[in-house]
């Protein structure tokens, strides 16, 4: 039980002091519990709340808690029932070691008032640790001469438990040589010992393995064991002995000096020095001044120490002995009989003279390489010598005289296949057994320049980014020559040719020794997409041989050209363009179209359009097509809209980084009926000085005059046809095609058949004109009876050379209605140049080069991008004058009709009939002009 503070009678002052002590000072009290180690989690220890005199309901309010400086997580209190329980595994040996007493001290703290209680929990030991030995095996050396009752101490076991659980008992496995004895030391600890009860013999039992077991006194008992390995030490009590009392050996008289005669073998059952044997020769009979034999003292190997001669001695008797190294030493004896046989003991001799080396690989068959002579000191059949040569070689031996031979060339040589030959000349006598001798002849083959340098492949493809720095290393060619030395020394050079107007050497160079190819100047993808040339490799032989390899260098495009705005009718790209727009137009009305080109290709030439932030306001009713460049109204115009708008259109490509240009469009809003009959661009020039038109060139004036004349004729014919039409034909019904006129430049045709039109009092039906190339033959029957199927695009429509530089413009792709993926950009389907499109859908022209499609023709196609879907027999809103880059949209408007829309148009000044050289010069001039206009436009921003 816990005694909380001393109690007794006292005055009021004493009671007050006790209350203060209870509230502010630490109260004292102590509890004692016990628990066994290794108890499971949740094991009951004691009702600590009840023993401390605390109610269960006040444990939480008074912040009942257990604090311990060490091992605080081993025990825990359940605040619901006030029971102290085991929280985690308790290991007494880890907690207290081998101490006899082991307890866990806890401090229990409660507040309101503050009280501290001390709790000691005794940890009781259980037999959870078996006795163990420090090592798994103990080695005990014992001499075989050790006397009986000899004691050999062993290392005892240890038990981590205490008390009875640590009391140990030893037991030894059964054997006839040793018994176990327990020795008690001064500290009351016990030590096991082995006592020898029977003498040992190492030759019979060199080792003895015993098992020592130990048992503790716990319940249940735990055991341990250790292997006892007894090694019996040797004593020199045995002498060496040979495996045979005598040996017999037969030798030929021609055996070489130091030849092994026999290997003797003696054994000693002892070990160590007692078993180490040393061999020696005691006597050799017959006695001679020269010792003909020697013996190795360590191995017992007998070798010849001189030359045996059958004519001198035909037999020898060798007496040998073996002595161990024990103390005292012991010896064994034996005898070796050697019999000598008479044989053919003289070998032939071979001599090679007059060598002609090295041999040229182009040497003639039959060329003498060397002279060979042979001899043998024997006589008779033993002295007759026959020579032979290594087989399967391009050489042979030719006998020239007795015992003389010539080594000659038998077949053609090839140094690249075999550069040297190791020939073996064998001379064999006629003895029995025959003797032979060999001589080696090394024949080197000298190189002849018969192999040209060879490349790994006949052609290489190299990719180089444009705008590379001068002297840039772009590739390395390597050729291999199978010849040797200077015949294999390869040098590289360019195979000179013309690349356009320049020499190949002005573009690239090749290092003569390394084969590295360098670009001498920055390459321009727009000027040169593919550079194909050959590199020659020649060796230094006489005469030199060579070969060529082809290199195809593709110049990869980089975004180094900003979008260039196509020239306005005034003749300057990037200048302000004025447009007049009636206020009565509805949403989606196209005001103008911005046209731009990019000299790059691929993504670098894919253009997008957007209004500059300065031009985008909350009330500006205009929007530009992302990929079409068409500026259209976003809503119906009203009186609140400003009469004039200055729009800045940003044209941006998709390169990395993107390059931009800016176009300025001036839009003036006019009331209905106030639009002048002349071109909106011309009228705006009088209103706004910034949009004033420049002088129109002579060709444009002539074209407009011709078109105006044709327009008047068309109107007259149209009026006649309308008056003669049946009354059943509605004003909005499709009309029949009518042939207007025919001229040297083509046929002009008018069509209203199958035309989807809108009947409106404000906007009467409009008629379209279109110009076809002269190759299109139209008859009146064709015009009056259009085919039921849609017409295929005319393959004769072509862009002139003056606009070849603009073939990469993505705006033309958008005009053609081919950007069907919307803003998806890269997912769009690029148009082809085929004129056999099965079902054209919209009246625009599509550039075949804008997205990397290589062609110089423009094909008329229909697509969903056209706001008006024409019927199969109808003509589009725009026409192309053959031989001119202009795309002209001409519509016949009634007197009070409003101007529908205007386009940015370009008229070329170069004719297709000019020479090719002049075309290139004109294209370069126009490209420079467009770049200058782009720069001017950027400065306007």
Curated annotation (Swiss-Prot):
Any one GO BP annotation for this protein: homophilic cell adhesion via plasma membrane adhesion molecules
- SMART domains the UniProt entry points to: CA (SM00112)
Sequence ranges of the PXXP repeats: 734-737, 790-793, 823-826, 863-866, 882-885
The organism's superkingdom is given as Eukaryota
Spell out where the chain crosses the membrane: 698-718
User: What function does the entry list?
Assistant: Potential calcium-dependent cell-adhesion protein. May be involved in the establishment and maintenance of specific neuronal connections in the brain.
Q: What is this protein called?
A: Protocadherin alpha-12
Lineage here is: Eukaryota, Metazoa, Chordata, Craniata, Vertebrata
């Amino acid at each position: 039980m816990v005694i909380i503070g001393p109690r007794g009678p006292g005055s009021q002052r004493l009671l007050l002091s006790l209350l203060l002590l209870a509230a502010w000072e630490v109260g004292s009290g102590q509890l004692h519990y016990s628990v066994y180690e290794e108890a499971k989690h949740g094991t009951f220890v004691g009702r600590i709340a009840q023993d401390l005199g605390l109610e269960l309901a006040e444990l939480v309010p008074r912040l009942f808690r257990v604090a311990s400086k060490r091992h605080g997580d081993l025990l825990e209190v359940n605040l619901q029932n006030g029971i102290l329980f085991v929280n985690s595994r308790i290991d007494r040996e880890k907690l207290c070691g081998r101490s006899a007493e082991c307890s866990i001290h806890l401090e229990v703290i409660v507040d309101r008032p503050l009280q501290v209680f001390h709790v000691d929990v005794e940890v009781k030991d259980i037999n959870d640790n078996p006795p163990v030995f420090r090592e798994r095996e103990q080695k005990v050396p014992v001499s075989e001469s050790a006397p009986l009752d000899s004691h050999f101490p062993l290392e005892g076991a240890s038990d981590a438990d205490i008390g009875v659980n640590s009391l140990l008992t030893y037991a030894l496995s059964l054997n006839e040589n040793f018994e176990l004895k327990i020795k008690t030391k001064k500290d009351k600890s016990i030590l096991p010992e082995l006592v020898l009860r029977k003498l040992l013999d190492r030759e019979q039992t060199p080792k003895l393995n015993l098992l020592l077991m130990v048992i503790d006194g716990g319940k249940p008992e735990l055991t341990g064991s250790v292997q006892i390995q007894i090694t019996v030490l040797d004593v020199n009590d045995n002498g060496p002995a040979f495996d045979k009392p005598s040996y017999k050996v037969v030798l030929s008289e021609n055996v070489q000096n130091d030849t092994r005669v026999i290997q003797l073998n003696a054994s000693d059952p002892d070990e160590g020095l007692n078993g180490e044997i040393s061999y020696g020769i005691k006597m050799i009979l017959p006695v001679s001044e020269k010792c003909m034999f020697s013996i190795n003292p360590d191995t017992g190997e007998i070798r010849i120490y001189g030359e045996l001669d059958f004519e001198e001695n035909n037999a020898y008797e060798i007496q040998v002995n073996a002595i161990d190294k024990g103390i005292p030493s012991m010896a064994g004896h034996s005898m070796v009989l050697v019999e000598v046989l008479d044989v053919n003991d003289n070998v032939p001799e071979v001599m090679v003279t007059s060598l002609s080396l090295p041999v040229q690989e182009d040497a003639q068959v039959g060329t003498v390489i060397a002279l060979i002579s042979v001899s043998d000191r024997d006589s008779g059949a033993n002295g007759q010598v026959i020579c032979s040569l290594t087989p399967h070689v391009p050489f042979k031996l030719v006998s020239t005289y007795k015992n003389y031979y010539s080594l000659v060339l038998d077949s053609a040589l090839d140094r690249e296949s075999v550069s040297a030959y190791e020939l073996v000349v064998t001379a064999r006598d006629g003895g029995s057994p025959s003797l032979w001798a060999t001589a080696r002849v090394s024949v080197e083959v000298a190189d002849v320049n018969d192999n040209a340098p060879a490349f790994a492949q006949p052609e290489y493809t190299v990719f180089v980014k444009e705008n590379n720095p001068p002297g840039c290393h772009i590739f390395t060619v390597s050729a291999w020559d199978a010849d040797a030395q200077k015949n294999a020394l390869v040098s590289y050079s360019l195979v000179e040719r013309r690349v356009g107007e320049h020499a190949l050497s002005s573009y690239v160079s090749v290092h003569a020794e390394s084969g590295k190819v360098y670009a001498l100047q920055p390459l321009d993808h727009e000027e040169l997409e593919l550079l194909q040339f050959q590199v020659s490799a020649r060796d230094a032989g006489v005469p030199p041989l060579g070969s060529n390899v082809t290199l195809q260098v593709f110049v990869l495009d980089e975004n180094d050209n900003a979008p260039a705005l196509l020239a306005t009718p005034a003749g300057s790209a990037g200048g302000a363009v004025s447009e007049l727009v009636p206020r009565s137009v509805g949403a989606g009305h196209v005001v103008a179209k911005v046209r731009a080109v990019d000299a790059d290709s691929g993504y670098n030439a894919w253009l997008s359009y957007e209004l500059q932030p300065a031009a985008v306001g909350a009330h500006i009713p205009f929007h530009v097509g992302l990929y079409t460049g068409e500026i259209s109204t976003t809503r119906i115009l009203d009186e609140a809209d400003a009469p004039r708008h200055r729009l800045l259109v940003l044209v941006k490509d998709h390169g990395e980084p993107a390059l931009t240009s800016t176009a300025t469009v001036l839009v003036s809003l006019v009331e209905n009926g106030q639009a002048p009959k002349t071109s909106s661009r011309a009228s705006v020039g009088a209103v706004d000085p910034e949009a004033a038109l420049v002088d129109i060139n002579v060709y444009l004036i002539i074209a407009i005059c011709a078109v105006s004349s044709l327009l008047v004729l068309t109107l007259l014919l149209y009026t006649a046809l309308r008056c003669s039409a049946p009354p059943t034909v509605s004003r909005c019904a499709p009309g029949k095609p009518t042939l207007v006129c025919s001229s040297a430049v083509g046929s002009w045709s008018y069509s209203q058949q199958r035309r989807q039109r809108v009947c409106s009092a404000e906007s009467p039906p409009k008629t379209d004109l279109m110009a076809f190339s002269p190759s299109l033959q139209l008859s009146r029957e064709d015009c009056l009876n259009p085919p039921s199927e849609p017409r295929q695009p005319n393959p004769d429509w072509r862009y002139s050379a003056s606009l070849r530089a603009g073939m990469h413009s993505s705006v033309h792709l958008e005009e053609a209605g081919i950007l069907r993926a919307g803003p998806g950009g890269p997912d769009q389907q690029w148009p082809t140049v085929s004129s056999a499109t099965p079902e054209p859908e919209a009246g625009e022209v599509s550039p075949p080069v804008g997205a990397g499609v290589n062609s110089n023709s423009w094909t008329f196609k229909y697509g969903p991008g056209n706001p008006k879907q024409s019927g199969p027999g109808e003509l589009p809103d725009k026409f192309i004058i053959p031989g001119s880059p202009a795309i002209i949209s001409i519509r016949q408007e009634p007197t009070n009709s409003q101007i529908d829309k205007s386009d940015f148009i370009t008229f070329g000044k170069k004719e297709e009939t000019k020479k090719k050289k002049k075309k290139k010069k004109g294209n370069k001039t126009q490209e420079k002009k467009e770049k200058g206009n782009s720069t001017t436009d950027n400065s306007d921003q």
